[in-house]
A protein has these predicted regions:
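Active-site core of bacterial EAL-family cyclic-dinucleotide phosphodiesterase domains
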Residues: 433-504, 602
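Early transmembrane hairpin of solute transport permeases
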Residues: 15-159, 330, 344
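Cytosolic juxtamembrane amphipathic/interface segments immediately preceding
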Residues: 7-29, 66-67, 163-175, 322-324
Length: 649
């Protein structure tokens, strides 16, 4: 596979970030929370659907119990997102750095967070698990996990010779975890005590909100203030901070208050207001993610199709957490650029349009869940507002498009690098005569294998595996036959190393379908060749798991009944290693298929008593010698003698 280092904007930063355990853990932890984001998003949609008749009905049906039940689901899903993030990020970090004790990481992080966020003697309020506390939760979780791992590693090294053989493993792990857990918990307890003595608030996001309110009180709500407001609210998502919540006080007490004061005074509404941002700068939610979804749809990339399907309906109502954490935007140095840029450009275009009189100002407050086009008309009282939204939508989609290309190119490059490492590991195992275990190793390796396995399964189902034929030439330079080969060209990783594809299929229970697909394609093409009057020999490699399958012979016989080969021959090549490793059912099933016209060859035949005995007890039409035997046949008399002996057998 050709490896080319593409010049991609943000590539170095992205590569560095993807090499850090804590950043990988944050991303994967947030991904694990997506089902709860989806459930919570639909609950918000059900309770905030911007139709007055519906709102009256949902609050009155069953005496309001349906509405209450929806709120219960919301509070248990989206309303508890910080709790989920603490557990999933700590679990992901533990899985990234070691394969055991993930529970200790999770519980230690949760207890540390609960200690840090307590206030006074009242204990813990459930509100500390809402989205506004998510950044604080992630920060405490990462620090707790890193400290826990550091202390545990040092402590484990210190006591490694103090345990005797036979000690229960779970008990030993628990004892080893006591000191690290204690250190982490008391570290946060001491820090919380110091902050309490200093009178410092523990919610980092709230601290930032207070400082920003004072800042905007000085800057004002003009063009500079509006640009800074949007920049800060969008860039904060890169760090996992809910930008809209962090600047909620600024948007309501400054920008929205300016609109209500103008309406009350009977003067012209200001250009910039909370309604202006919701209608013209945040189409589909933060970052104008409806534009992002449109760009994804237009590119028709299979990889992003699931994200589009899951995110499009909520985004129509400006609910976009699914997209923010699914793409993701969080900790993504490539996608954060258009995420910030699109709202700023849309704000500039909308402000100029209002300033020169093309569109009336957004002087009527509308619900933030009101869909595009409707919100433009209702807020301005003019169809011009809807037309402006459509123009801004096109502009935003256009800006997102090239950044999606960059992001995909970077993802493809990372996958290529990981696949190349996997290939190198497999080749090293082959040289040692070992079989690679694809399900063990680093987290990156296991995730790469999961990705390739999923893609291979889809490729088999969709018939995307290519069939190639390698000619077999006689000593007289004539074509004796062909060997059927399946080759997988991955859409991102490129040409896949064939033995690695076989191992992926074998270790993930895909080999039966993979092998039968090759046999059927070979049979179909052999029938075409026979009709052209070419009596060729078609060879197909067979692996152990296929012969061990109880349905293998039935499926092969069904294929043989479907196609007719005339003077051509279908041959199954069985490797010597496979023949010696399989159970006693193999000869019986070989005989069954021989009666149906299948010819058997032994492939990669070597030496040894077991090999010779197997050759003696089974009827093979031909033997393909292993390369180690024929490599020196011209200049080594012993090799010549051995091969002559095999020929006589």
């Amino acid at each position: 596979m050709e490896q080319k280092q593409k010049k991609i904007f943000g590539n170095n930063l992205s590569t560095w970030m993807e090499s850090k355990d804590f950043i990988i853990a944050m991303r994967r932890g947030l991904l694990l929370c997506i089902p709860f984001f989806i459930i919570g998003s639909f609950c918000v949609l059900l309770t905030s659907f911007p139709v007055a008749v519906y709102q009256e009905w949902i609050r009155e049906v069953c005496n309001g119990m349906v509405y209450q039940a929806i709120l219960w689901v919301y509070h248990a899903s989206m309303g508890s997102v910080t709790l989920f993030v603490i557990l999933t990020v700590s679990h992901s970090y533990a899985s990234q750095v070691e394969e055991e004790d993930t529970g200790f990481y999770m519980l230690t992080s949760l207890v540390s967070y609960m200690i840090f966020v307590q206030s006074g003697i009242e204990g813990i309020s459930y509100t500390v698990f809402e989205a506004t506390w998510m950044f604080t939760g992630i920060l405490i979780t990462i620090i707790s996990c890193v400290v826990f791992r550091t202390v545990k590693s040092a402590y484990k090294h210190h006591i490694k010779n103090k345990y005797q053989a036979g000690v229960d493993v779970d008990f030993q792990n628990t004892v080893e975890a006591i000191l690290p857990i204690t250190c982490v918990i008391f570290m946060w307890a001491v820090l919380r005590l110091l902050l309490a003595l200093l009178g410092v608030e523990t919610d980092i996001q709230n601290i930032g909100s207070g400082l920003l309110t004072k800042l905007f009180g000085v800057i004002g709500t003009g063009a500079v203030g509006a640009a800074l407001f949007l920049f800060l609210s969008q860039i904060s998502w890169f760090f996992g901070i809910h930008g809209s919540d962090m600047l909620h006080v600024v948007s309501t007490e400054l920008f929205e208050k300016g609109l209500t004061d103008s309406i009350a005074a009977g003067v012209s509404a200001p250009i910039f207001s909370k309604t202006f941002f919701d209608v013209f700068a945040l189409i589909g939610g933060s970052g104008s993610t409806l534009c992002l979804l449109a760009a994804i749809c237009l590119r028709n990339n299979k990889k992003d199709r699931t994200l589009f399907k899951a995110g499009i309906v909520p985004a129509l109502f400006n609910i976009n957490e699914i997209v923010l954490f699914g793409l993701p935007v969080v900790l993504n140095p490539i996608m954060i650029i258009p995420f910030v840029l699109v709202p700023l450009v849309q704000t500039a275009v909308a402000a100029i349009s209002i300033f020169i009189g093309l569109v009336p100002p957004a002087s009527v407050q509308v619900g933030w869940t009101t869909p595009i086009l409707f919100s433009g008309y209702l807020s301005t009282g003019s169809i011009a507002g809807s037309i402006l939204q459509a123009v801004l939508f096109i502009i935003g989609t256009t800006i997102y498009f090239p950044f999606l290309e960059m992001s995909d190119a970077h993802s493809a490059q990372m996958l290529q690098n990981n696949v190349e490492k996997l290939k190198e590991e497999m080749i090293a195992c082959e040289k040692k005569g070992e079989i690679i275990n694809l399900k063990k190793g680093s987290k990156v390796k296991r995730e790469t294998v999961k990705t390739l396995t999923r893609d291979l399964k889809e490729a088999i189902t969709a018939g995307e595996i290519k069939t190639f034929y390698q000619p077999q030439i006689t000593s007289k330079n004539t074509v004796y036959g062909v060997e059927a080969l399946l080759r997988w060209i991955h859409p991102e990783a490129g040409f896949m190393y064939p033995p690695m594809v076989i191992e992926l299929a074998r270790q993930n229970h895909l080999l039966d379908d993979f092998g039968i697909m090759l046999i059927e394609r070979a049979a179909q093409d052999l029938e075409h060749l026979s009709k052209r009057g070419k009596p060729l020999h078609m060879a197909v490699n067979i692996l152990p798991v296929q012969f061990e399958s109880d349905t293998f012979c039935d499926r092969v016989e069904a294929i043989l009944a479907k196609y007719h080969f005339g003077g051509c021959t279908m041959c199954f090549e069985i490797t010597e290693q496979m023949a010696l490793a399989t159970s006693g059912v193999v000869p019986e099933r070989m005989l069954r298929l021989k009666k149906n016209g299948i010819v058997f060859h032994m492939d990669d035949f070597g030496m040894g008593h077991s090999s010779m005995q197997y050759l003696q007890d089974n009827e093979f039409e031909a033997v393909k010698l292993d390369g180690s035997l024929v490599k020196h046949v011209l200049d080594n008399e012993r090799c010549q003698t051995i091969i002559a002996g095999i020929y006589q057998m």
